[in-house]
Amino acid sequence: PAASWHLTPAGLGPVRIGMSRDEVSKALDVELRGEALDNEGSCIELFPSGGALKGTYFMFLDGKLSRISIAEPGEIRTPRGIHVGSTAEEVRKAYGEKLQAEPHHYVDLPAEYLTYWLKPDVRGVRFETSHDGKVQIIHAGTGSIQLVEGCA
């Protein structure tokens, strides 16, 4: 079923932004593993223990799903057809003028962050491109899609 799911600012397949860890686990019928990304345990990044969602990560802030990240090529795409491996040019054509571009924090140009906001700083999709101009990671969800190093 994951092959037909779209990654949107609202979620992925049956998974919705705002769900608890248990709700996400039940929706996917898979155990989530991972660890806290901060000392307080308020930010956790988890991944499915197996199955078709390899390279998918779920960020929980204060117990609620805030971001879904896809970091490996596969079947999952945005509703506009963008996937890990798409070119920055394909992202620009798909999302048009509403796309915000900024330089990547750790990789030289042409690597960049291309962000599409459904509602500014509240819900959106961020495409992280690499030095080859291709999408390396897609983040979708709340304003946490802007976080560069885990929860920071």
PLM regions: where:
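A cross-family detector of function-defining hotspots
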Residues: 20-62, 83-142
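Extracytoplasmic/periplasmic, Sec-exported soluble proteins
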Residues: 12-16, 79-83, 119
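Short, low-complexity, Pro/Ser/Thr/Gly-rich segments in the mature regions of secreted, periplasmic
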Residues: 139-152
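Surface-exposed aromatic
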Residues: 7, 72-77, 108-117
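N-terminal post-signal-peptidase region of extra-cytosolic proteins
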Residues: 8-10, 39-46, 73-78
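Mid-length scaffold segments of soluble, non-membrane domains
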Residues: 68-71, 81-84
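N-terminal low-complexity, Pro/Thr/Ser-rich intrinsically disordered segments
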Residues: 1-14
